[in-house]
Amino acid sequence: MRLIVLKVQGVSPLYATWRIDEWCRPYFSYYGANWTSLYWCFNQCIPVWLITSLILLNNDLKSVGFWYSFTLLYSPWAAMGLFPVIFIYVAYRLFKDIKLMLSVLTLQNIVFPLFVLLVVGSFYMSNRHPLADCGWWWKFEQPMVFLPKYIAFILLELGIYFYAMRNELCKSSWLIISFVVLLFIPFYKMTVWNDFMMRASLPALFIVFMYWTRWCMRNLHSRRMLIVVVYVVTSLTALQLMVNSLVDTVRAGKPVLTNANERFCNTSDLEVVKLGDGQFFAHDYKTTFFWKYLSR
């Protein structure tokens, strides 16, 4: 599929193995591979993965809201993606046994999340500039143009895993919920590069790939070896990203100078400056609730 897409774009097939998880660009956004997320936003994905793991391991509901609230401190978009996963799971558990309601209504599930929401929410609301390219996909494309892309994307990104693990679905509500959430995330877009889709998908993708890894470990025999081989081939992304970092370091011969070493958005690209100024800087911040009551 990536070869076909690149051929249409006029790109050499030799490039086909580079960043396989981005096969659908520029026709659609993408779900980042685990190593891609580590490469570009390790400060977000590692905490989110750890928090998701804690929630999965903690089978009772007494602290699910407590652990969830930590995602707001690291990645608000990932928090948006994890919220429906937890909400549906808790609702499902309560539907099966309403007596669990007392387990949900605990101090740590109510007080701490509200406190974090107050601090983090007021901080982000200090920037009153609207996000560029924010809204439902049909705001940017006609439905009949979007839907074929969406169907192809879902079939190729999730279809293989769904089919392979179809027998696992009836055993795990976490897996079913994660697939459902991943079906809906592509319908909304935030920022030019659609950071929402790449970050909000982190928790659900992590859950899916944990189950996928377990499935592979249980099925390493010849009849299903082809699927495992395909999974190994896609790991080229991790190797390429590591090589990319090593090569850049060797070429530089010293720490690579980036905008972070000087000033954020210190570039001659006016579009980047305009985007960064609106998305990452809070103007008139001294009039905001966060500055007046929380920051000092």
Locate each region found by the language model.
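Conserved catalytic motifs of ABC-family nucleotide-binding domains
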Residues: 1-55
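Transmembrane catalytic cores of multi-pass membrane glycosyltransferases
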Residues: 2-16, 42, 73-168, 172, ...
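Membrane-embedded alpha-helical segments of multi-pass membrane proteins
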Residues: 26, 30-34, 41-50, 83, ...
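Membrane-interface alpha helices of multi-pass inner-membrane proteins
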Residues: 35-36, 53-54, 62-87
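Hydrophobic transmembrane alpha-helices
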Residues: 52-60, 84-96, 209-217
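Short hydrophobic alpha-helices at membrane interfaces in multi-pass membrane enzymes
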Residues: 56-71, 99, 109-110, 176
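Hydrophobic/aromatic-rich transmembrane helices and adjacent perimembrane loops
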Residues: 195-218
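Intrinsically disordered, polar/acidic, low-complexity terminal segments
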Residues: 224-296
